[in-house]
Amino acid sequence: MNLFSSTTLTMLFVLTLPIMMTNTNIYKSDKYPTYVKNTVSSAFLISLVPMIAFTNTGQEMIISNWHWITIQTLKLTLSFKADYFSIVFAPVALFVTWSIMEFSMWYMHSDPHINQFFKYLLLFLITMMILVTANNLFQLFIGWEGVGIMSFLLIGWWHGRTDANTAAIQAILYNRIGDVGFIMAMAWFLSNLNTWDMQQIFMINPTHSNLPLMGLILAATGKSAQFGLHPWLPSAMEGPTPVSALLHSSTMVVAGVFLLIRFYPMMENNNLMQTITMCLGAITTLFTAMCALTQNDIKKIIAFSTSSQLGLMMVTIGINQPHLAFLHICTHAFFKAMLFMCSGSIIHNLNNEQDIRKMGGLFKTMPFTTTTLIVGSMALTGVPFLTGFYSKDLIIEAANTSYSNAWALLITLVATSLTAVYSTRIIFFALLGHPRFPTSTLIHENNPLLLNSLKRLMAGSIFAGFILSHNLPPMTTPLMTMPPYLKMTALAVTMLGFTLAFEITLNTQNLKYKHPTNSFKFSTLLGYFPTIMHRLPPHLSLTASQKLASSLLDSAWLENILPKSMAHAQLKLSTLVSNQKGLMKMYFSIIPYH
C-alpha cells in the first residue's frame, strides 16, 4: 500500500473512532461534540493528501483487499474506488461537515441529547463516504440505505412534534420508491451480467441497457427530489437547521445525481436515457424555482432552491457533461450550507421565527450574517468570480452549444433567471427595510462557534470554485468556441432576474393587498401537487379497501362461516324433523311382520 491508498483508508477509519467511543465515558461527557468536530477536521486534513496527489499526478486507485462472500460464480469483495469523483468529493464533504458541526455546537447547545445528535451526524457522513467510495453496487447500496435511515432519524429529531414525524416518514416513503428502482437495476445486472463490480459492468457495456438505467434514474429521482418525488425535500425542513444544512447541501440529496454520474459510461451512448434525464431535470428546476418565489418560510425557500439546483445537475448529465455536474455538486455544497446556516442564525436569534414577513432590518443588528447571506445568494445566482459562477456558467454554456432539446434549455434559462428573483426576495424581506420582529428580541451574533463556521464557508463560497476549476484536470472536452451572445447568456438571464425583482419590489411597496392571482396560488400551493397526491390516492385506496373489507369479509365470509351456516344447518334439521311429524304409524305399517 502506498501513501495514496493508506491516507484514503486512514481518513475513513478516523471517522469511525467517535462511533467506537459510544460505550465509553467520553460519549457521556460534554466534550463529545468537540471531539467529533476535531475528528472531522482531522479527516479533512488527511483527505487533502490524496487530493493533492491526484491533482499533481492524476493517479487513481481501486483498493480491493477484503474478500467478502462468494455466491456461485459471483465474488463480492469489499473494495473502495479512489478516483476523480471520490477523491475530490471527500474533502468538500468533510470541510462542509466540519463547519456544520461547529455551527451545531452553538445551535444545539441546549439540547439534552446533543451527544446523540452529533453521533447521528457523524454516522450520516460515514454512510455518505461509503456511498461515494464504493466500487460495487452492493457496497453502494449499503451507503445508499444508510443515508436514507440517518435522514429519517435526523429529520424526526424533535419527535415530540407531529410535523417532524410526518416529514421523516414522508422522506423515507418517497425514498423507498427510488430504492425499488435501485434494487431492480441491481437484479438486472446480477441476472444479465453476473457482476456488481462497476469496472466489469462498464467493460461489458450491454447494448440493451434501458431497463437498468430506468431503475437508476428512478432511484436518483427519489433521492435527489426530482419532479414527481420532490415533496419530501421542503417537508424535511422540519428537522433542525444543521440537519438541513448537511442533508440538503453537500450529502444526501446529491447522492442520486452522484449515482448517475458514476454510471455515465453506460449513459453517454444512450440518447433516450439522456433525453429523459434532461427533460426531468428541466421540469424540476423550473417547477421548484416557481414554488420558491412565493414561499414565506426562509428554510423552505432555500430547500426549493436546492431542488432547483439538483434539477440543473440532472440537465447537465442529460447533455452528457457528468464531470461538469460533479463540479456543480462540489461548488454548490459551500454556499448552500452557508445559506442554511445563515437562516439558522436568524431563526435562533429571533426565537425560532422562520417567516420572512416577520423579519426585516437585520442588516443593522446582524451585520456578519447579512454579509454571508448576500455572498451566498450571489454565489447561488452565479455572479461572476464567486464559486457558483465557475460551474453554473459552464453548464449554461454547454447547454447553449449542445445539439439537444431546445425546450429543456429554454426552461432551464427561465429557472436560472428565477433564482435571482427569489434570492433578492430573501434579501429584501429578511435583511432590508424596517424591523418587523418584537422589540424585546435579544440579538447577538458574537459566538465564535457561529462566526468561525460561517467565515470558513464564506471563504469557500468565494474561492472554492476558482481553486477547484483551476486545479482539477479536465475530463471531458471543453467547448472551444462560441459566439459572445451565447457566452453571456447565463449572466444576462441572471441580471434580468435581479432587475425584475428590484422593479417589482419598488412598484409593489405601496400597493394595497388584492385578491391573489391564479399563478400566485399555483406557486404558493406548490403546484397543487401535495394537495392532490397526498389526498386523492390515499382516499381512493382507503375507500376501496373499506368496501372490499366490508363487502367481502363482513357481508360474505364472516356471515357465511358462522351465523348463516348455522342457520342453514338448523333450518335443514328443523325442516327434516317437521316433515317427519305424524308419519310414525306409516313407518310402523311398512315394517314387515314374520
From Swiss-Prot:
Mitochondrion keyword on record: yes
Entry protein name: NADH-ubiquinone oxidoreductase chain 5
Organism: Hippopotamus amphibius (Hippopotamus)
GO molecular function: NADH dehydrogenase (ubiquinone) activity
Assembly with partners or alone: Core subunit of respiratory chain NADH dehydrogenase (Complex I) which is composed of 45 different subunits.
EC identifiers of the protein: 7.1.1.2
Keyword Disulfide bond among UniProt keywords: no
Membrane association type: Multi-pass membrane protein
NCBIfam families per record: NDH_I_L (TIGR01974)
Catalytic activity from the UniProt record: a ubiquinone + NADH + 5 H(+)(in) = a ubiquinol + NAD(+) + 4 H(+)(out)
Gene (UniProt): MT-ND5
